[in-house]
Amino acid sequence: STSPPGIRDLLVLGKIRQLETEGAADLIILDAPAAGHAITFLRSATGIAEAATSGALHSQATEALAMLGDPTRTRVMLATLPEETPINELIDTAYSLEEDVGVMLGPVIINGTWPPLPGLETDVEQAAKAADVSLTDDEVVSLGSAGAYRTERCDMQQGQLARLARELPLTTLNLDFVFTNELDQSDLTRLADELLAGIDALDPALTD
């Protein structure tokens, strides 16, 4: 025999609810699946509550719905990249979660933002001359191209973040892109510090 659709997701929600009601921790963080499955996961309680109108399954589902719908107990923090397609997916997911699941959204985490670098608008040859540095023609071209790419990338990201702010007015927590092939402990510490600084700067009403 097969389990009813959503039963496994409901069991996970039930375990989370058990940990929460037992006071197992001050804060329980669930790293949910990607957007499409996350919506299905959180909708599972609604589907089962409607399908099973009585009994243990109905009780489990209604208790899970009560937990999800209470902003003092549950909030969803979405994460995205500052690019067009991920931003589109984030906006669709956010509205679906609010309207279909009834869960309250917390701040959005923006991964991989490129902070603007001052001075990129300066002519490469003028900057080299001011620094008393000699450059070959190839170096001038390469540095100019790199600076133009960095500026274009930053402008694109800022444009997408501005669109996100217009279409989904939620507070954001931005994490800078780490320019390395592999993150080490110092990189993780830096990102954690950035995230904590962003949380500390939030309106207290968002973290109550």
Predicted regions, residues:
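Conserved phosphoryl-transfer catalytic core
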Residues: 1-5
